Swiss-Prot record:
<dbReference type="GO" id="GO:0003725">
    <property type="term" value="F:double-stranded RNA binding"/>
</dbReference>
<dbReference type="InterPro" id="IPR014720">
    <property type="entry name" value="dsRBD_dom"/>
</dbReference>
<comment type="subunit">
    <text>Homodimer.</text>
</comment>
<feature type="domain" description="DRBM">
    <location>
        <begin position="159"/>
        <end position="228"/>
    </location>
</feature>
<dbReference type="GO" id="GO:0005737">
    <property type="term" value="C:cytoplasm"/>
</dbReference>
<feature type="binding site">
    <location>
        <position position="46"/>
    </location>
    <ligand>
        <name>Mg(2+)</name>
    </ligand>
</feature>
<keyword id="KW-0699">rRNA-binding</keyword>
<protein>
    <recommendedName>
        <fullName>Ribonuclease 3</fullName>
        <ecNumber>3.1.26.3</ecNumber>
    </recommendedName>
</protein>
<dbReference type="GO" id="GO:0046872">
    <property type="term" value="F:metal ion binding"/>
</dbReference>
<keyword id="KW-0507">mRNA processing</keyword>
<feature type="binding site">
    <location>
        <position position="119"/>
    </location>
    <ligand>
        <name>Mg(2+)</name>
    </ligand>
</feature>
<comment type="function">
    <text>Digests double-stranded RNA. Involved in the processing of primary rRNA transcript to yield the immediate precursors to the large and small rRNAs (23S and 16S). Processes some mRNAs, and tRNAs when they are encoded in the rRNA operon. Processes pre-crRNA and tracrRNA of type II CRISPR loci if present in the organism.</text>
</comment>
<comment type="similarity">
    <text>Belongs to the ribonuclease III family.</text>
</comment>
<dbReference type="Pfam" id="PF14622">
    <property type="entry name" value="Ribonucleas_3_3"/>
</dbReference>
<dbReference type="GO" id="GO:0006364">
    <property type="term" value="P:rRNA processing"/>
</dbReference>
<keyword id="KW-0694">RNA-binding</keyword>
<keyword id="KW-0540">Nuclease</keyword>
Length: 229
């Protein structure tokens, strides 16, 4: 059994177009180092998967919470599809082992980079939608995401920057700073990278579609670091 057969068995779906599945796990760095193979990276699938994920999660929340206000549903959805959550979902189904990376990206630790894993999860959703349809996407989410919603994991949506400030300032006054490290992607699909620094020490890094989302993501990773020490 090769890795792609193993992956299909793991997720519980057979792909009619296995090349589409491979593309979902192909980082641009791999494409740059294998130009003769005529392979495609996963960026377009990520774009599609992002939209499919938002739609399916929105539909689930809409039906599960018929009396919930729009603003609260929006916050819940944002917490579900944010980078740290997507990384958690990707790790739960062991997606990192299947990612195709260039040698340089591999050496730089790309296989465990949060933004990369989040992108792979979205690109897989895009590929699954194209190959198997929306119903199979929902079936997959019923295994990976919806049980966490049912368990109430996202009912208390949190301002992570405020929570981090409360955690680190319990015992003493500290200086918390956020830096935007850069931005990537085309104008219609930009991603920003941010880090949070507490008293001169980098505690978390994250990325998001906006600078505010990137800072929230960095704060969430910092909280995870502090609470799992």
């Amino acid at each position: 059994m090769n890795q792609w057969e193993e992956l299909q068995e793991s997720v519980g779906f057979d792909f009619k177009d296995v090349e589409l599945l491979k593309q979902a796990f192909t980082h641009s760095s791999y494409v740059n180092e294998h130009r003769r193979e005529n392979v495609k990276d996963n960026e377009r699938l990520e774009f599609l998967g992002d939209a499919v994920l938002e739609l399916t999660v929105s539909d689930y929340l809409f039906n599960k919470y018929p009396d919930m206000a729009e603003g609260h549903m929006t916050k819940m959805r944002a917490a579900i599809v944010c980078e740290p959550s997507l990384v958690e979902f990707a790790e739960a189904v062991h997606f990192s082992k299947y990612v195709r990376l260039g040698k340089g990206e591999e050496k730089a630790g790309g296989r465990t980079r949060p933004a990369l894993l989040a992108d792979v999860f979205e690109s897989f959703i895009g590929a699954l939608y194209l190959d198997n349809g929306i119903d199979k996407v929902v079936t997959f989410l019923e295994r990976v995401i919806f049980p966490k919603i049912d368990a109430g994991a996202y009912l208390q949506t949190v301002d992570y920057k405020t929570q981090l400030q409360e955690i680190v300032q319990r015992d003493r006054d500290v200086l918390i700073e956020y830096d935007i490290l850069g931005e990537t992607g085309p104008a219609h699909n930009k991603a920003f990278d941010a880090q949070v620094i507490v008293n001169g020490q980098v505690l978390g890094k994250g990325s998001g579609r906006t600078k505010k989302q990137a800072e929230q993501s960095a704060a969430q990773f910092a909280i995870n670091q502090l609470t799992h020490r």
